[in-house]
A protein has these predicted regions:
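Hydrophobic/aromatic beta-strand patches that form the interior of the parallel beta-sheet core
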Residues: 15, 45, 83-85, 120, ...
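Active-site-proximal beta-strand elements of phosphoester/diester hydrolases
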Residues: 13-21, 118-125, 225-230
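Core catalytic region of metal-dependent phosphoesterases/phosphodiesterases
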Residues: 5-13, 22-114
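Conserved beta-sheet core of the metallophosphoesterase superfamily
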Residues: 102-109, 125, 129-139, 182, ...
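Active-site-proximal loop/helix segment associated with metal-binding centers of metalloenzymes
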Residues: 124-188
Length: 288
């Protein structure tokens, strides 16, 4: 295995990522790890659905996903301020909103003021009608989406064996219903934009809908730059604040780097049993 030569870290004012869905088979942890190891932001905003508590299984947490967590901790130790914005898939963390430990805090939103430009950052589920009135339907949809990604992986294995290109079933389905999805997204965007304009923010940043975007939205009272950080399930996108503006970036392996130690096979997973967890806790209690 060839090891890529390390490149200089990209120094940024801020980075926003969302919808990583750690703890599920949908998460593209290796790519996310590579991206995080390529940047050095002053602020890292984890904009919701970072850990997928809805679908989390204690028997499944791949090493690659564990390394993502370790990398975020390492970034905090090196001075990056990390703010965890709670989403719907990790809503159990809402009871801890307001908690701050060192460079880490759990919040419902972030208002980031860089050089006088205010960014209003929140997950976006607050403006999701399904989440407000039919949470069971949202959870059912999440389960179906997870099942689809598993089927997708199996299909891609067979396609690879026959030398065919990989496909994304969920992306194809989105294209089939593009007009309907565009209507839903537009309503979501307009709601966010109207409030942002009213509050006089320059930028409004969400996640939640797995639909990366950067666009101006106007109404009779003004305009705002609407951004969506996308996800790390299909789109592999992030938002970077540099040179007094936000950029929507797509993961490119050539712009990142991994060492041999970081490269982890998707099938290489860490099975965490209750017994192992108890033993670890017991050792921690007894250690100096």
């Amino acid at each position: 295995m060839n090891t890529k030569s390390k490149k200089e870290l990209k120094r940024l004012d801020a980075v926003v990522i969302s919808d990583t869905h750690l703890g599920t088979r949908s998460c593209k942890a290796k790519e996310l790890l590579a991206y995080l190891k390529s940047v050095q932001p002053n602020h890292l905003i984890l904009n919701g659905d970072i850990i997928d508590i809805w679908q989390f299984s204690k028997s499944y947490f791949p090493k690659a996903q564990l390394k993502v967590v370790r990398q975020i901790i390492k970034m905090m130790e090196q001075g990056t301020k990390v703010q965890y914005v709670v989403g719907n898939h990790d809503e159990a963390l809402r009871r801890f909103v307001g908690t701050t430990v060192g460079n880490f805090s759990i919040v419902n939103k972030v208002v980031l003021d860089i050089n006088g430009a205010k960014s209003w950052i929140f997950h976006g589920d607050a403006f999701d009608v399904v989440m407000q009135h039919s949470k069971w339907l949202a959870k059912l949809g999440a389960t179906g989406y997870a099942l689809l990604t598993i089927i997708n992986k199996i299909v891609n294995v067979f396609l690879s064996l026959f030398g065919k290109m990989r496909i994304s079933l969920s992306r194809d389905i989105k294209r089939m219903v593009k007009s309907k999805r565009d209507d839903i997204t537009t309503k979501f965007e307009k709601t966010v934009a109207e409030l942002a304009i009213k509050k006089r923010y320059k930028y409004a940043i969400c996640g939640h809908i797995h639909w990366p975007a950067k666009k101006f939205i106007e109404n009779d009272h003004g305009k705002v730059m609407y951004l969506n950080s996308g996800d790390w399930v299909e789109n592999l996108t992030a938002l970077e604040f540099e040179n007094n503006d936000w950029d929507l970036v797509y993961f490119n392996e050539e712009d990142s780097f991994l060492t041999d130690e970081d490269l982890v096979d998707d099938a290489d997973q860490m099975l965490v049993s209750d017994k192992l967890l108890f033993q670890t806790m017991f050792q921690d209690v007894l250690s100096d």
